[in-house]
C-alpha cells in the first residue's frame, strides 16, 4: 500500500539499458525501411523482500513472462512511436492478494514543418494506458500511485509555433486518470483521482543557447469517492470546518525561467514560480512556490555516456483521505554507460520523493513521508536477438507527524531481478 517512486528519468535510462546495435539493428523493416516492427518477449525472475511495502516486510518471488510489440515510423515530417505489452505474473508465494496480469500501451505521434529549430509548426500527441499489478517496477507512469493494483491513463496534446528566430510559443492540454482496484476485504480503501490541465508557454531566444521562458497552467481535479457512505450524494459534511467537503479541486501555477542548450550535448531547463491549489470543493486552499528543472548531458561524442537530472513540485488530491491534498517534491539523478562496443550497458539512478499530506477536516493529522529509491541495472547483448539483464533495487521510507505516530508507514525494501529478452 505504499508509494513507488519513480520519475521521468526511469524511462530514459530504460531505453539506454535496452538492447543496442551489434551487427545490425534488430527489427523487421517495411515501407522502404521507414517503419520498424520490434516484436519481443522477455522472461524474468524477481525476489522481493517486502511485497506490501510495510513494516511487516513479507517477502515473495515471482516469474514474469512479458511479450510485446514496438513500432517506429519516421520520415521528413512525421514520427510515430508505439508500444503494446502484456505481463503474466506467476507468484511462487504470497499470491492470494496479487493480480496475475498487467498490460498496457503507449503511443507518440508528431508532425513538424520546422527544421533545425527554424520557423514553423510542431504538433505532438501522446497517450499511455497501464493496468498495473501491485508489485510493479518503478517505471510506471512516473511512479505515481501507491503500491496497489491500479489503472492509469494519460494523454497530452501540444501545438507549438516558432514565429521567427527570437519568439516561440506553445499551447498544451493533458488529462490524467488514476483508478485503484480496491478490495476492502484485503486492504484499506484508496481514492483515485483525475486531472484536466490547460497550459500556455511563451519564449524569447536571447542567444544561440539561451531562451527566456514563461508558462502558465490551470488544472481541474476530481476525487473518486465511491467507497464512502455518501456515494449517492454530492457532498459530505466537514466536521472541523463546518462546511461541505466535495471531491472537486482546482489549481493554477505561473512560472518563469530559462531553457538552455550550452552545446549540442548539454541542455537544461529551470523554471520557478507560484502555485495555488483549492481542494475539498473550496473548503481549503494551499499556496506556495513551485519549480521544474531538468538537465541532460551526453558526455562523449560516441553517445555511450549519458547523465540526466530532474526535479519538480506540485499539488494533487490525497489518495488516503477524501477531499484532502498532497504536496509532492520529486528529485532524481541517473547515469548510463555503454562498454564493449555497446554490448555491455550499465545504468544507475537515485530518486527522492517527499509527500506532505494536508488533511481538510483535521489539520493535526497532517504528516510527511520521505521516500528514497536507488537502482542499478546491467545488461549484456549476447547476439542480435538475445539480451540478458539484471537489476537490484532498494527503497526506504521515513514518516513523521501526529497521524503516523509510531512510524507506522516506515519500511525498507530490496528487489533483485534477472531476465532474458529476445527481440526479433
Residue ranges and their predicted role:
Residues 1-29:
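Cleavable N-terminal export/targeting peptides
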